[in-house]
């Protein structure tokens, strides 16, 4: 999903615009939250005006929606605040209307907003994937440890949608009053969030109030986190959510990505060798900045003055110099107690 980093942003600072697209009924207004220039996929705060009505039909894009305020009639059902739906491409929805008007968060995931009038599903539609639920009333809160390592206690979730192939998720999350988590996080996936109610605080971006929104591509630092009075928000990821926690606020997205790769190398060396190093029988692992960064306090014998003046040229306490001229490719691998010489042939 090629959307730029958007953070911080609050839709309360923007005015609604009329949504005029072929097939979509008049009476819709929107605030664009994020937009994919490649596919037309987008997330919008959408106002359905009083008296709005749309004929039965389907979209060429999968889409999701959660009601923020008001009521919407969908077929013979009435959806109220907190009602959520996931609609696969080609799934024909019944007539949609709103007598008094309705505010919703609408997300088109795989293409631009579209509507083809039809009372029948498209022949290729995966109709079994459709679902809707009153997320406020009919789903209990669960501990936020769906992803491990987990966030601090006091952050809870309700899982709304899950893709078993990509592990992409849509979920509600809440922070209890006085929630606090002091570390920094990044992920291997894009992450999206919209505050339905309440304010949270993030070290890099400040307060995120009601109507606050972010689209955060992979490997961007965020946190520490806090919420004085609590908040509730909708969150989404485009693949598996894994919390890479650390305490270095100056690491870059490139360094964070290298660290993620390093953790694969450390955790699954055979997988790493197969996936990344098919033509090299002794791969050198990528850098994990937490293993190499200079730390305050006990430096375990590192010559800090030499480090400061000569960059990475430094002697370790165990008594050898990686950069000595006579041992240009001489490495000591911690843990096996053996010296290994690597001969590189051109």
Language-model segments: what does each one mean?
Residues 280-289, 293-346:
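Histidine-centered metal-binding segments
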Residues 69-70, 197-199:
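Glycine-centered positions in the ABC transporter ATPase nucleotide-binding domain
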Residues 28, 78-79, 89-118, 189, ...:
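Ligand-binding loop in jelly-roll beta-barrel domains
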Residues 65:
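Structured binding elements
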Residues 24-59, 73, 77-81, 88, ...:
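Conserved short histidine dyad/triad with adjacent acidic residue
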Residues 1-38, 114-167, 259-308:
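A short, N-terminal "cap"/entry segment at the start of jelly-roll beta-barrel domains
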